Structure formats: C-alpha cells, structure tokens
Amino acid sequence: MSDILDRIIAVKREEVRAAEQSAPLEELRLEASSRDLRDFVGALRAKHAAGLAAVIAEVKKASPSKGVLREHFVPAEIARSYEKHGAACLSVLTDVQFFKGSVAYLEQARAACNLPVLRKDFIVDPYQIVEARAMGADAILLIAAALETSQMQDLEALAHSLGLAVLVEVHDRDELMEALTLKTPLIGINNRNLRTFETSIETTIGMLEAIPDDRIVVTESGILSRVDVERLRAMDVHTFLVGEAFMRADEPGVELARMFF
C-alpha cells in the first residue's frame, strides 16, 4: 500500500468512529430503507447494447496529486450536463479531506438527474456502505489495495444485500486475482501507479486477457483524449470512468460528448 493510501485509510477509520457517534447504524439503516435505487450495472449494459461507450462521469472538485481541478463547482449543474451529453452513470467524490468532496455533492448531483450514482470514497468499514445507501448512492467502490480479500468479500455481501452495485478497483495483476474472487461483474482497472502517480492506459490493456468475458472492465484514470478512447474500444473496453478531463473543461458534458460520441 502506498504512503498516501495508508494516510487516507487511517483518516477513514477515524471518520467512521466519529460518524457512528453522531448517526448510529440503526438510524442509518432506517434512512437507507426509504431511498429509491437506480440500476447502475443495467445503465452500463444498456449503453453497451446500443453499441455505445458507457461513461461513468465523475463529479470531482480536487485530487491530492493535482489540487483543485474546477473552481466553478456546482454538482447539480455538472450532473445535468453529463446526463444531457450521454453519460451512463455518475461517480461523486464524498471524501472531504483529500478530494474536497462531500455527501451533499452526491445528494445534489443525484437529485438533479436520473442517472445511477457511485459513491467514490475509501470504504474500509461496513458502516460506510449503509451510509452510502442512506445518502442515495446506487453503487460503491472497493479498492483492492486498501482491503484484504476477506474484507472485500464481506463488504461486497453487505452492499449487495442493500441493493448496491460494487465496483472493485485494482492496480495490478495480484489485486486483479483477488478481485476476481468477488461476485460483482464490475472490475475497475486504475491506470494510475500508486507510487509515482503517473498514468498509462497500458495498465488496462496489459490485464485484459486475464479477465473473464462475463466481467465488465471499467478503465479508470489517465483517459484524456479521443485517441485514448478509440485505442481502448479497439481492445474491446467499452466502460470508462473519467473525471479530470471533464472537470478541466468549460462544459464537462460537452467534453464528454467530444471524447466519446
């Protein structure tokens, strides 16, 4: 695990302890049960069936490596722009300390559109999964580099019991082998090297032959141009999670359409 990931995980554990005091788990479960669900995996498959790229478009204000990506940051506006220009789903950062995200951003983005929404955060505890459902998320992220295989399996089982889709994210072959023990069809390959923070779509391409056909490969990070998209689609990768390229554009949805459609 990288130093930054170690730091983030430590902060997450503290956040969970504090959150459990202010909003007990049973209270959250009650709130979660009243939320509607949107079909995250179904939305991706619908794009594939139409012969289109399935884009999980990210609502992200900042990152630890790049700082603030977008000064004019209005999640509802961004979500509507993404939906209008063909996104399949949204990904919304809820991590406050490292990515300047917020639960409120997820709630605002989801309320502004009809797209399913992934809670993008560092999940280390079952509490965060119930919390995700309570805030209106339709899917959660599990990061293989941050979790033991048995932890991932337990967290996935809880997520699925609540109706949430699970995107499991890997950075290398060892993590991929762990991820493939899960039931989720969604295998995210993060093209960012956790030690150097450099990105290369070769990371995704190099792992494709090890992934069964019944899984949906989601390529993440470092997709910055139409050339990247065309290269990956030629390799039969049709699902993309993109944030930075859209966030730096004047009109995020227009940039999405320019890159993908």
From Swiss-Prot:
Pfam families: IGPS. The lineage of its organism: Bacteria, Pseudomonadati, Pseudomonadota, Betaproteobacteria, Burkholderiales. Transmembrane segments: none annotated. SUPFAM superfamilies: Ribulose-phoshate binding barrel. It is an enzyme of class 4 (lyase). It catalyses: 1-(2-carboxyphenylamino)-1-deoxy-D-ribulose 5-phosphate + H(+) = (1S,2R)-1-C-(indol-3-yl)glycerol 3-phosphate + CO2 + H2O. HAMAP family: IGPS_B (MF_00134_B). PROSITE patterns: IGPS. InterPro entries: Aldolase_TIM, Indole-3-glycerol_P_synth, Indole-3-glycerol_P_synth_dom, Indole-3-GlycerolPSynthase_CS, RibuloseP-bd_barrel. Signal peptide: none annotated. Keywords: Amino-acid biosynthesis, Aromatic amino acid biosynthesis, Decarboxylase, Lyase, Tryptophan biosynthesis. This is Indole-3-glycerol phosphate synthase.
